[in-house]
């Protein structure tokens, strides 16, 4: 396995970083370092999703430390239940986390992604969120928990599959990136995380696009704080019962109650 990043990989890394060191934020010069997020000495691969652009000083100071985040009890339980459903039972590729807004679903989802990455089950992560500001928060939390940088992409970014990195986008961007997302899921083992899943109404343009774009995803993690749809619309990936409530197996669902 090669240790050094290629020139093409370095170009992608500095593009993702916006030309700035991804630790201190200073503008990078030509002598910037293409660094392994998970150290090469600890099994880290020389791929863009495990790379970051750093100034020489920050790379030296960084050493080989990997971040650890302490989970709340419910986040730990959700992660373990999800891993058991997806990897042990393998009854279905979808897992649902139902918890109120602000409860910490993003952290729980990122910890699940890290677990799947560490176990060698996935290569890429794609996050779909409702708004740009939420997308930005995902990028920050994802890095803090996994140590991997996640780039925001829009319809204008084109061939996302060539970036070889984890990405996040709004639901509305899905239709314009449908072919690229489809290619990513066909070429790599991909976890798709759907934040505020009720935004993906089946009849809406981004709902139809998502259904096609992610049909080959290895796993789909569905986050919702609205298990019932008052408008009667159906969403992708999940079925609903006669009361318009999500109808998904209990073993494939984690629900956070107010008592928790």
Model-assigned labels for residue ranges:
Residues 106-108, 121-144:
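Conserved Walker A/P-loop ATP-binding site and its immediately adjacent core
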Residues 90-112:
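Walker A/P-loop
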Residues 4-33, 55-57:
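Short cysteine-rich loop/turn motifs with clustered Cys
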Residues 202-260:
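Post-DEXD/H (motif II) to motif III coupling segment of the RecA-like Helicase ATP-binding lobe
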């Amino acid at each position: 396995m090669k240790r050094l990043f290629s020139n093409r990989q370095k170009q992608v890394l500095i593009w993702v970083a916006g030309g700035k060191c991804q630790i201190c934020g200073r503008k990078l010069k030509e002598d910037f370092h293409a660094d392994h997020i998970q150290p090469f000495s600890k099994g880290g691969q020389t791929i863009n999703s495990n790379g970051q652009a750093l100034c020489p000083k920050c790379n030296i100071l960084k050493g080989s430390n990997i971040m650890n985040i302490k989970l709340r009890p419910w986040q730990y339980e959700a992660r373990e239940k999800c891993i058991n459903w997806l990897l042990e039972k393998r009854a279905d590729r979808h897992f649902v986390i139902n918890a109120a807004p602000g409860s910490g679903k993003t952290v729980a989802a990122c910890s699940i992604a890290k677990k799947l990455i560490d176990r060698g089950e996935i290569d890429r992560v794609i996050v779909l969120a409702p708004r740009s500001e939420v997308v930005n928060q995902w990028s920050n939390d994802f890095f803090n928990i996994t140590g991997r940088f996640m780039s925001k992409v829009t319809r204008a970014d084109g061939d996302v599959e060539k970036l070889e990195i984890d990405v996040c986008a709004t639901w509305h961007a899905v239709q314009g990136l449908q072919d690229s997302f489809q290619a990513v899921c066909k070429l790599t083992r991909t976890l798709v995380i759907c934040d505020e899943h009720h935004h993906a109404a089946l009849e809406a343009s981004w709902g139809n696009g998502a259904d096609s774009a992610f049909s080959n995803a290895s796993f789909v993690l569905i986050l919702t704080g609205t298990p019932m749809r008052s408008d009667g619309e159906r969403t992708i990936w999940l079925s609903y019962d006669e009361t318009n409530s999500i109808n998904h197996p209990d073993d494939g669902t984690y629900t956070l109650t107010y008592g928790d």
